[in-house]
């Protein structure tokens, strides 16, 4: 499956992509794709980094240099409210971070890369497209392999 040019990471995917073991994959990803981050994802990532006693001002500068950080705007807020209200009517209580991340991916027309696709399953009918992080990594590795042939 050819990957689209625009992707969005959720917070768990972003944290894992910034691990030492994913350094090469991250470099390739940043070279090949426009990577969007919801401002909520940025907040969650910075929270983890602050917990680890990192300089989060510096961390934010790095994120701003390499990612397209998507601020919460009216369109995203409306889409998120529609999604959450619909899911609540169906008896679900979605996590606000997931709803805002999904709404951001829909707004940017990008593929949401996540470490837990099941969390986003009920939101797919709103136009959300997701891919598990491990599958994305394999697709990127295949893409590189094909370029080397």
Curated annotation (Swiss-Prot):
EC number: 3.1.-.-
Protein known as: VapC ribonuclease PF0355
Binding residue positions for Mg(2+): 10, 98
Record bears the keyword Repeat: no
HAMAP family in alphabetical order: VapC_Nob1
Cofactor annotation: Mg(2+)
Classification via Pfam families: PIN
Disulfide bonds: none
């Amino acid at each position: 499956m050819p990957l689209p040019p625009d992707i969005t990471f959720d917070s768990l995917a972003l944290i894992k992509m910034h691990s030492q073991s994913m350094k090469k994959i991250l470099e390739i990803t940043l070279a090949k794709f426009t990577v969007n981050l919801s401002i909520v994802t940025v907040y969650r990532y910075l929270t983890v980094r602050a917990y680890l006693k990192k300089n989060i001002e510096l961390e934010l500068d790095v994120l701003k240099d390499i990612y397209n950080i998507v601020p919460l705007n009216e369109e995203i807020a409306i889409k998120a409210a529609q999604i959450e209200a619909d899911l609540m009517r169906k008896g679900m209580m979605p996590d606000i971070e997931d709803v805002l991340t999904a709404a951001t991916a829909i707004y940017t027309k990008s593929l949401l890369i996540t470490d837990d696709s099941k969390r986003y399953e009920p939101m797919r009918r709103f136009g959300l497209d997701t891919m598990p992080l491990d599958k994305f990594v394999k697709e990127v590795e295949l893409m590189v392999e094909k370029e080397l042939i």
